[in-house]
Amino acid sequence: MAVPKKKTSKSRRNMRRSHLALGKVNVIVDSQTGEYKLPHHVSLVDGTYNNRQVVTKRIETEEAVA
C-alpha cells in the first residue's frame, strides 16, 4: 500500500487545492419578465427564448391532477 514519505505542508496542500474553487454563476435579468435567468436558456416563467414563445404552458385540470 502506498504511503507518503513526508508530510504534505499546509502551503503545498492549499496550492494544490487552488484550482478547486467554484466559479460565479452568470445570471441576467430577463427583459420581458424582470426575473433572473441563465443566459442562452429558456425563461422558466413564460417559456420565451430570444423574445419568441418556444414553450407553451400546460393547463392542469382537476382530472389530470387526480
From Swiss-Prot:
Gene Ontology annotations for the cellular component aspect, listed alphabetically: large ribosomal subunit
Keyword line: Ribonucleoprotein, Ribosomal protein
Protein's UniProt keywords contain Ribonucleoprotein: yes
Pfam families linked to this entry: Ribosomal_L32p (PF01783)
Record-linked Gene3D superfamilies: Single helix bin
Molecular functions per Gene Ontology: structural constituent of ribosome
Gene Ontology BP annotations: translation
Family designation: Belongs to the bacterial ribosomal protein bL32 family.
NCBIfam families: rpmF_bact
Protein name: Large ribosomal subunit protein bL32
Species in which this protein is naturally found: Rickettsia akari (strain Hartford)
Name of the gene: rpmF
